[in-house]
Amino acid sequence: MSIFLLLVGLPISANAKSAEEDRQEIREMRSEVLAQLYQNNPEAKDLIAGAEGYAVFNNGGVNLILLSAGSGKGVAHDNKSGKDVFMRMATGGVGIGLGIKDYRAVIVFHKRAMFDQFVDKGWDFSGQADAAAKIDDTGGEANAADSVVSGVTVYQMTKKGLALQATLQGTKYWKVDKWNN
């Protein structure tokens, strides 16, 4: 029986990514997102360079009538120490909407206390209204997203998806021990 359980579990563990593979995937995502941000908003480069820190996340989300949910992963970078903190995120909310959206977010922290709170406690509560339509490299997007917290600038870029929504969302960000050891 124990041999059977070992063999059944083998394919799952053989396909599991190592912590370094996860970190590398997140670093590559960060590089791509920042390149896209700087191309679309050149002023963001100086804003990020002068900030206490920033975070970059990918997020896939679904909005069905009155409920929305999503999850993703990313990294918070401390500009003063140069340290990266690898994290996950999950969102949930209520509001009117319909669609699926794959987007990237860059969160810029202008105050040290805000960056430290984000990394240590990880909560954000946002109101969001947007319309996005983008499939592959076609389509367009229009976003109006702003954190309720002052001292923070948020950029959102839709990668793929189609969504029309007006939601009140809670987002939880947290450190992933496996990725930070």
Language model feature labels by segment:
Residues 17-181:
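Small-residue-enriched, tightly packed secondary-structure blocks
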Residues 2-11:
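Bacterial N-terminal signal peptides
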Residues 12-16:
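Signal peptide processing junction and immediate N-terminal pro/mature segment
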